[in-house]
Regions:
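Active-site phosphate-binding/coordination module
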Residues: 1-83
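Conserved acidic, metal-coordinating active-site core of Asp-based
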Residues: 72-165, 171-172, 179
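Short, charged/polar "capping" segments at the starts of alpha-helices
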Residues: 28, 120-121, 191-193
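Short low-complexity, flexible loop/linker segments enriched in glycine and/or proline
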Residues: 32-36, 113-114, 151-152, 200-201
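Short hydrophobic/aromatic-enriched beta-strand-loop microsegments
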Residues: 38-44, 98-100, 183-188
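Mg2+-dependent phosphoryl-transfer enzymes with acidic/Ser/Thr/Gly-rich catalytic loops
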Residues: 1, 139-231
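Residue-level detector of anion-binding/catalytic polar loops
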Residues: 16, 134, 182-183
């Protein structure tokens, strides 16, 4: 894995890795054990920061979101996570049962499968906005969440004389990249290009692109290489 030597180098130098994900808390907790990562983490597209058992919220509760969606149901055709069981979420996402259960364990957002026209979707998004919420179009889902984004929590984490480096490859990463001191666009697979200005850009995709750019930045800051052998 090209990422592991970079993570070891960061760990030895005291450079924390703070994950900022669209995933749920349950999903990230299942993943981070393999990395040995105990840093704060941001979930559900900037909706909350968890630091141990402490939580700082930037979005609104899923209960409030579902309540707001009730009044829109008669006018629009959509189906959300809250309307179905784990088997259907497995079909929608291609996830195995345990992973689908973690994906369903949401506190600050509701993914919708849109079943209406594009024109209706635009109208729906406007009405959601009027209710103090926002929509975020992902690959498969239209996500409804509070008025937050991946950039807002970065201000909460900001410390004096500390540079924030952010790396991402999708539209929902843009606010985070713009809020960071150093924003890095990781090349996306296929023909998709994230439109962003004054950003560093990788030549590789995915984890290789992440490792490429973090190595470049650590070299720039003269962070020493790890003495750990990943053999």
């Amino acid at each position: 894995d090209p990422v592991l030597p970079v993570l070891d180098r960061m760990d030895e130098a005291g450079v924390p890795l703070i994950v900022n994900t669209s995933k749920t808390r349950a999903e990230w907790l299942a993943l981070r054990g393999d990395l040995g990562n105990l840093e704060p983490y941001i979930v559900e597209n900037g909706s909350a920061i968890y630091d141990g058992e402490e939580v700082q919220t930037f979005g609104v509760s899923r209960v409030e979101i579902l309540e707001s969606l009730k009044s829109l149901r008669p006018k629009f055709k959509f189906k959300g996570y809250s309307d179905v069981g784990v088997p259907e979420i497995m079909q929608w996402t291609g996830l195995e049962r345990q992973s689908a259960e973690r994906s369903a364990d949401r506190h600050f957002s509701e993914p919708l499968v849109w079943q209406d026209s594009l024109e209706k979707e635009e109208e729906f998004c406007e009405l959601v906005k009027e209710r103090g919420l926002k929509t975020l179009r992902g690959g498969r889902f239209l996500h409804v969440l509070g008025q937050t984004d991946k950039g807002k929590p970065l201000e909460h984490l900001r410390k004096e004389n500390v540079a924030i480096i952010a790396l991402g490859d999708r539209p929902n990463d843009l606010a985070m990249l713009e809020a960071a001191d150093i924003g890095v666009v990781i090349k996306a697979p296929g023909d998709y290009i994230l439109e962003a200005v004054d950003m560093l850009r990788s030549t590789e995709t995915g984890p290789r692109g992440w490792a490429e750019m973090m190595t470049q930045i650590l070299d720039q800051f003269q962070i020493p290489y790890s003495t750990i052998n990943n053999g």
